[in-house]
Each structure stands twice: as C-alpha cells, then as structure tokens.
C-alpha cells in the first residue's frame, strides 16, 4: 500500500486508428478499479498519428492507495474514445473491443498480470 507501480505498455498499430483514443491501466480485485492511470495521448502521441511502423512504448506510474487492503489485484489495460459520444457524455468512453487469435471479441480490456499487495 502507498507504493508506486511502474510499468510500460507496448502498443502495436496494424493501421492508423480512425479515432483519437485515450488509454487506461486499472488495478482491481474483481470490482471497480482501486487505482488507475488514464492518458489522453498514449505514449505522448495522438493515436491518429500511430502508423504500422512498429511498437509504441507507453510508460505508466500508478500510486497505490495508502489504505489498500492486502490481497491479489489484476492489472488491465485498454483504449477508449470520446469522439463517438455526445459532448460531455464520455464517462468510461467508448472502449475499443479486444479480440482473440480467432477473431472472437473477448471484452474491452486486456488483463496484463496480477500483483500481490502485502
């Protein structure tokens, strides 16, 4: 509890995205996030400028709450846009869907790993 969690997400665009996306990393234990980081321009670059030229490194620092109970937490990452929604109604945004190798939609965020808080 109270520690900083540092990680780097590697994004890879197969084509230039149609919309400008925000990125998020959530720390959760089966419910709403207990800590998170959101970025307007992942890796400091608008996603509309991403090309298929390789991986994009996107570093994050998340401060875990001082009163965070001990336990196991899952880190998830995803992208969302507000461009497809009415002005002022972004909320969680319109999240980009995640697909498995067979092309089946499996949700709107990718689990990265679990961490143990002591």
Predicted regions and their residues:
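C-terminal luminal/periplasmic domains and tails of membrane-associated envelope-modifying transferases
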Residues: 1-118
């Amino acid at each position: 509890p109270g520690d900083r969690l540092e990680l780097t997400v590697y994004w890879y665009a197969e084509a230039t995205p149609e919309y400008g996306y925000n990125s998020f990393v959530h720390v959760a234990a089966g419910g709403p996030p207990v800590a998170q980081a959101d970025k307007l321009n992942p890796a400091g670059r608008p996603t509309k400028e991403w090309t298929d030229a390789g991986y994009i490194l996107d570093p994050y620092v998340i401060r875990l709450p001082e009163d965070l109970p001990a336990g196991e937490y899952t880190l998830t990452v995803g992208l969302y846009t507000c461009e497809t929604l009415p002005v002022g109604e972004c909320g969680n945004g319109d999240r980009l869907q995640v697909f498995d190798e067979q092309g089946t939609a499996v949700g709107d965020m990718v689990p990265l790993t679990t961490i143990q808080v002591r």
